[in-house]
From Swiss-Prot:
Binds 2 Mg(2+) ion per subunit. It holds the Pfam family RuvC. The active site is at D8, E67, D139. This is Crossover junction endodeoxyribonuclease RuvC. The keyword Membrane does not apply. The RuvA-RuvB-RuvC complex processes Holliday junction (HJ) DNA during genetic recombination and DNA repair. Endonuclease that resolves HJ intermediates. Cleaves cruciform DNA by making single-stranded nicks across the HJ at symmetrical positions within the homologous arms, yielding a 5'-phosphate and a 3'-hydroxyl group; requires a central core of homology in the junction. The consensus cleavage sequence is 5'-(A/T)TT(C/G)-3'. Cleavage occurs on the 3'-side of the TT dinucleotide at the point of strand exchange. Homodimer which binds Holliday junction (HJ) DNA. The HJ becomes 2-fold symmetrical on binding to RuvC with unstacked arms; it has a different conformation from HJ DNA in complex with RuvA. In the full resolvosome a probable DNA-RuvA(4)-RuvB(12)-RuvC(2) complex forms which resolves the HJ. It comes from Pseudomonas fluorescens (strain SBW25).
Length: 174
């Protein structure tokens, strides 16, 4: 049974979700948000890095799924998002984690069944799949969805003898 970390990166709020992959599906372990406040970008990135590292050290996941950068409303937002992703990826890499990237469409498809799902639909399916009794924060819900997507990807690869998710194209090899 594998512990999986999902990360929904952001320069102000980074969501995290930890699930345990079992033969019967995913089981909820933990979720939350790393809030950086309104400081300088370098300080906020350091908070993201330290927060992700703390989650990894607290729960001990061995693999991480993280959302890919999408084209934001403006280029500056996309750059900041990419930098927050980088901080989270470095935290995982330093802990020796296997890291995989997923587009928002891939995550929605894996959790809801359609890549056009909205955030509320994703949140409701995450609650249903993990048997949660209350709504997680939206960023934490997105991170749990990423973890579930990563679990589905891993389980679809393992029966074919391909090993871990890093064997597929588009994965980070660190």
């Amino acid at each position: 049974m594998t512990l999986i970390l999902g990360i929904d990166p952001g320069s102000r709020i980074t969501g995290f979700g930890v699930v345990q992959q079992t033969p019967r599906g995913c089981v909820y372990v933990a979720s939350g948000c790393i809030r950086t406040g309104a400081g300088e970008l370098a300080e906020r990135l350091q908070i993201v890095y330290r927060g992700v590292r703390e989650v990894i050290q607290t729960y001990g996941p061995v693999t991480m799924g993280i959302e890919k950068v999408f084209m934001a409303k403006n280029a500056d937002s996309a750059l900041k998002l990419g930098q927050a992703r980088g901080a989270a990826i470095v935290a995982g890499a330093e802990e020796g984690m296997e890291i995989a990237e997923y587009t928002a469409t891939q995550v929605k498809q894996a959790v809801v069944g359609t890549g056009a799902a909205n955030k509320e639909q994703v949140q409701m399916m995450v609650m249903h799949m993990l048997k949660l009794t209350s709504k997680p924060q939206i960023d934490a819900s997105d991170a749990l969805a990423i973890a579930i997507c990563h679990a589905h990807t891993r389980s679809s690869l393992l029966p074919h003898g391909l090993g871990a998710a890093r064997s597929r194209g588009g994965r980070l090899r660190l």
